[in-house]
């Protein structure tokens, strides 16, 4: 341990204590490097004041790392060569494990001190970065339990839904690359889904035009599991686990009464039914619910739905139906549009909610029985308490693989998952050209949907089972989960 005489100032509270009392608390410590450090310190009260001079144990490795970074920064200011820095961002819809990928990038970056200087994070994605918002993640890693990212849901850095211009000569690219140069960025990692890979594609192509040696790598993320050229995406396994687990509880609640009823559960999925398909995992040896499962890949017909529901009610008193938000008829009209016109998001995608409510009203009118609709909504994409341990681990490894790829000279690529079932479930991490991935969509395989379009085959169950294995080990304080304080609250 490295012992140093420093000034210790009490944080927030003044405590009444005698001169003999010892207290363990959190304080702001100012050392000779002028770095503010929040540490667990032990001290004795000497006078009636909140400022004390005392000896505090400081981790020697953290001190050395801080000195090294300051020396690198000073060298850069003086015009000498600097180590290239990392810039990482998160974009699109959050997931339960997107921060595990962020942790992987940070951890692998810090591990390569001979090649990488500082790890920076975009606050609110590329949009926030354009506004000058970023954070020094190396400092966060030095002073906080950075591995807590793996149990922190949603996007620690903050997210955005911002599309870079199609015109690669637009001034926004000049601004971005000027800022990259000012920050001595050598590696940019963007964690996200389809539209995020579009950002990686554009930035890597602009770099080529500008003859920039900055390397751009995409790290996959989406609960929709709709990215092409990869077996699956981080975030999907946890969402599948959440959907199956929550559906089991909903089914028990919905079936505990002796009178006929229908419960319609609406799940995320605009054009791909991967999330809704996971509802099949909720079935047990004593209940076939959900009896009916409808996804966007199969045209939805109101009359056929009525017939199928009638048959289900003849076999089961209480029937649970699962539907994707994006189910549509044979003409491509969304069922949610039957009642109201759909609004549009920033990418021009129709914002789909309400098909569950529409079907609820339809069932009440046609069958005259109790019916309620439920939207699992945000928790299905970012609930960390039901996150899959497999998903967390794979997301972290994807982040690490991205750094390794960039240091190997790769750019304009996305990390891919390659399944190997030779000796049980195993994933290898590969690379694919991001231009072959962005703006494309992987549909749920038609052969995994029954001919009537109301059920899922066993092939899917074999595919998804390994992705939901293992349980997240959360940290608790006062009975509720503890997460790492998000960058946008700092």
Regions found by a protein language model. Give the residues of each.
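Accessory alpha-helical/coil subdomains and C-terminal extensions
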Residues: 179, 187-192, 198-207, 233-372
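Short, Lys/Arg-enriched N-terminal segments with co-localized hydrophobic residues
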Residues: 45-81
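N-terminal phosphate-binding or glycine-rich loops at protein starts, especially the Walker A/P-loop
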Residues: 83-134
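C-terminal non-catalytic interaction/assembly regions of soluble proteins
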Residues: 336-490
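Glycine-rich oxoanion-binding loops at beta->alpha junctions
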Residues: 132-186, 195, 234, 248
């Amino acid at each position: 341990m490295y012992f140093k005489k420093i000034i210790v100032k009490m944080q927030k509270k003044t405590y009444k204590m005698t001169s003999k009392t010892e207290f363990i608390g959190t304080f702001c410590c100012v050392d000779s490097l002028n770095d503010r450090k929040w540490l667990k310190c032990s001290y004795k009260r000497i006078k009636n004041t909140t400022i004390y001079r005392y000896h505090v144990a400081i981790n020697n490795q953290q001190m050395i790392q801080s000195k090294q970074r300051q020396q690198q920064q000073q060298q850069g200011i003086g015009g000498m060569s600097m180590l290239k820095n990392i810039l990482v961002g998160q974009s699109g819809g959050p997931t339960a494990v997107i921060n595990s990928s962020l942790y992987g990038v940070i951890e692998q970056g810090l591990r390569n001190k001979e090649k990488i200087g500082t790890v920076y994070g975009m606050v609110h994605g590329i949009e926030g970065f354009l506004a000058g918002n970023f954070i020094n993640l190396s400092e966060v890693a030095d002073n906080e339990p950075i591995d807590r990212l793996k149990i922190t849901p949603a996007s620690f850095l903050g997210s955005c839904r911002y599309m870079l211009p199609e015109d690669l000569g637009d001034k926004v690219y000049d601004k971005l690359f000027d800022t990259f140069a000012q920050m001595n960025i050598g590696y940019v990692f963007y964690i996200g889904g389809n539209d995020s890979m579009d950002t990686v594609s554009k930035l890597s192509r602009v770099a080529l035009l500008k003859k920039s040696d900055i390397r751009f790598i995409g790290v996959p993320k989406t609960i929709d599991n709709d990215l092409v050229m990869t077996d699956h995406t981080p975030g999907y396994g946890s969402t599948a686990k959440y959907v199956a687990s929550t559906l089991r509880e909903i089914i028990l609640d919905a079936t505990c009464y002796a009178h006929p009823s229908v419960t319609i559960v609406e799940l995320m999925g605009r054009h791909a039914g991967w999330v809704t398909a996971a509802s099949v995992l909720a079935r047990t040896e004593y209940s076939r619910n959900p009896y009916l499962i409808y996804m966007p890949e199969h045209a939805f017909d109101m009359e056929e739905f009525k017939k199928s529901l009638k048959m289900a009610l003849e076999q089961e008193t209480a029937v649970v139906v699962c539907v994707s938000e994006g189910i549509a008829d044979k003409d491509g009209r969304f069922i949610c549009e039957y009642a109201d016109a759909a609004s549009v998001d920033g990418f021009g995608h129709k914002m789909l909610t309400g098909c569950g409510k529409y079907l609820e009203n339809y069932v009440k009118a046609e069958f005259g029985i109790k019916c309620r609709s439920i939207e699992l909504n945000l928790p299905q994409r970012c609930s960390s308490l039901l996150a899959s341990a497999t998903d967390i681990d794979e997301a972290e490894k994807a982040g690490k693989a991205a750094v390794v790829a960039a240091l190997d000279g790769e750019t304009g690529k996305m990390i891919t998952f390659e399944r190997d079932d030779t000796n049980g479930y195993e994933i290898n991490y590969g690379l694919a050209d991001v231009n072959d991935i962005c703006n494309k969509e992987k549909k749920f395989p038609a052969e995994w949907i029954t001919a009537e379009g109301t059920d899922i085959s066993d092939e899917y169950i074999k595919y998804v089972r390994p992705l939901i294995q293992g349980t997240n080990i959360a940290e608790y304080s006062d009975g509720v989960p503890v997460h790492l304080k998000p960058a946008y609250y700092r």
